[in-house]
Amino acid sequence: MPRKKPFSVKQKKKQLQDKRERKRGLQDGLRSSSNSRSGSRERREEQTDTSDGESVTHHIRRLNQQPSQGLGPRGYDPNRYRLHFERDSREEVERRKRAAREQVLQPVSAEVLELDIREVYQPGSVLDFPRRPPWSYEMSKEQLMSQEERSFQEYLGKIHGAYSSEKLSYFEHNLETWRQLWRVLEMSDIVLLITDIRHPVVNFPPALYEYVTGELGLALVLVLNKVDLAPPALVVAWKHYFHQHYPQLHVVLFTSFPRDPRTPQDPSSVLKKSRRRGRGWTRALGPEQLLRACEAITVGKVDLSSWREKIARDVAGATWGNGSGEEEEEEDGPAVLVEQQTDSAMEPTGPTRERYKDGVVTIGCVGFPNVGKSSLINGLVGRKVVSVSRTPGHTRYFQTYFLTPSVKLCDCPGLIFPSLLPRQLQVLAGIYPIAQIQEPYTAVGYLASRIPVQALLHLRHPEAEDPSAEHPWCAWDICEAWAEKRGYKTAKAARNDVYRAANSLLRLAVDGRLSLCFHPPGYSEQKGTWESHPETTELVVLQGRVGPAGDEEEEEEEELSSSCEEEGEEDRDADEEGEGDEDTPTSAPGSSLAGRNPYALLGEDEC
């Protein structure tokens, strides 16, 4: 029997590290030499990985990786629909870090906030989305999938050949997720494209509009979601912008949590939050508009009277709940039939699919990640039936929900279309998972040059001895000042954790508590006209009518504390699985950072 070889403590440590890396699904087991939490986060994703097709040599980051030892008991791969983005090179990340430390931030003019869709997507260029290639029933499943993979690689090759990596935005490189979109479009009678009102041009790919209304011959309804986060005049301006440029669109305004815009707002109280309980989902603004749009599209081919009756019941129930002071959400309403689509349901359908089959209209909900597709479905149903999360890519596969016996909703995973947007803007739009950003500082600088972050958060320059003196700010200074104010420290050296502070600032922006809204072209010159527009007044009255009136709890303030340590190095974006709770920005004069109860906010994401 051979002698046992000595096994040192160092070797044992390396063995355990490799084992943990394999469980996380990482390929090369890179470990950071830094002991700080921020350093380990930034270097943990440094492994090289390629997409499923070997013809595209660009490095791909596979986000939302789930630990898995292969297929599950039912043959389900939890990483099948994870986000695939092009990886930033190490040199590019370091260059942006240096710029964040050295570049002095200058406020931009209002005209810079105006976005033209022609500059973002360049209609008619290769910035398209992949189409399902022609197929026939004689083809086997393997032949069809192989053909789709070849077509997808050709699509990626054209884009990367026409534009450099520095010009291209993040966009989806996972073919499995695009297959979800193909299936949803094939089975839908009406397509809802959900966008965020703060930046609707970012979420509106013209190629999808041309494909749905042209090649498929379907009606496209543009939903401007989260209208409570933008001024009513800006909402109306965006609505007219899309009507003017895309006449076949049906535009609907929507929000799951409306507020009265006539309520005075304190822009400095970004850390104030209130909890809405009870019948929050039944207060959604927009179901009536969406019903009218669907009635105009179906022109009597589908009986939608049951949908109208449901809306009337929801409105009456919400009014009764406010009057009686009831706080608990009613759970004994009509059951909602949920269908999870299996692989067999993902098979392509024929080109001559019957429209409004069996008297049922199928409404497909598509859009970018984090625009509120799942929240919109919850608002239409009147209670929570879909899990929602701040983390992009939370919806893994499409599901169908029967709103009424004649109305079926289909929720599609969020997809990011190729464009020429700055990647910092995509991060602020919530498209990229914040906890997995390699370099968040330039996104903070992009935000601070467009809204006065230092003034809103009452930040003190880290090098300022006299608080009244003015000092030039860079993105790194803002992150360091926020880390000092919030008490974010690294684990061992107790230095200011600027990486964690940058993530916290980006979460405030994504949540709408640091609201950055973009404008349609010419809005600055015509702002007064839009503010006095009749539709603006109508929207203000409508939001005030359906806004919260008695279903809000006492406001909560966030604690200035360093006791809220993050658990490990994993994504801390928690799924919002509560049964009717929703954190929403609110305003209150005299907001402070120190809460009276030091344990009240131990579960907050920013801690």
Swiss-Prot record:
Q: Which residues form the CP-type G domain?
A: 178-418
Q: Is the keyword Membrane in the record?
A: no
Phosphoserine modifications at: 32-34, 51, 68, 324, 561-563
Q: What functional role does this protein have?
A: Possible regulatory or functional link with the histocompatibility cluster.
Q: Does the keyword Nucleotide-binding apply?
A: yes
What domain of life does the native source organism fall in? Answer: Eukaryota
Name by which UniProt lists this protein: Guanine nucleotide-binding protein-like 1
SUPFAM superfamilies noted in UniProt: P-loop containing nucleoside triphosphate hydrolases
Ranges annotated as biased composition (Basic and acidic residues): 15-26
Q: Name one GO biological process term.
A: DNA damage response
The UniProt comment on domains reads:
In contrast to other GTP-binding proteins, this family is characterized by a circular permutation of the GTPase motifs described by a G4-G1-G3 pattern.
Q: Which residues carry this modification: Phosphothreonine?
A: 48, 50
The gene designation is GNL1
Q: Where is this region: Disordered?
A: 1-81, 547-607
Looking up PROSITE patterns in the UniProt record yields: G_CP (PS51721)
| Organism field | Pongo abelii
> What residues does GTP bind to?
225-228, 367-374, 411-415
What are the leading ranks of the lineage?
Answer: Eukaryota, Metazoa, Chordata, Craniata, Vertebrata
Q: Which GO terms describe its molecular function?
A: GTP binding; GTPase activity
Q: Which UniProt keywords apply?
A: GTP-binding, Nucleotide-binding, Phosphoprotein
Please give the family membership noted in the entry: Belongs to the TRAFAC class YlqF/YawG GTPase family.
Q: Which Pfam families match?
A: MMR_HSR1
The annotated regions of Acidic residues compositional bias extend over 550-584
Q: Where is the composition biased (Basic residues)?
A: 1-14
